[in-house]
């Protein structure tokens, strides 16, 4: 599965490690320093995005992902 990570703190890194161990591909990593990457072809190619930020940022992140037809959990 192609996965985009939204939030790359301690939990984001842990999710990346587990996903890779299980044979998934990380196609995009979005963090506060590269919000513009929501518009990248790599992000749009994801089968799913895993959002692990904070409640304040989460809603906007969901909207950005949905704008590219990427499902979010």
Feature names for model-found ranges:
Residues 5, 25-32, 49-52:
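Short, hydrophobic beta-strand segments that form beta-sheet elements in well-ordered domains
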Residues 40-48, 52-73:
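Rossmann-fold NAD(P) dinucleotide-binding segment
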Residues 2-15:
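Glycine-rich adenosine-cofactor-binding loop
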Residues 9, 34, 53-56:
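Short beta->alpha connector loops
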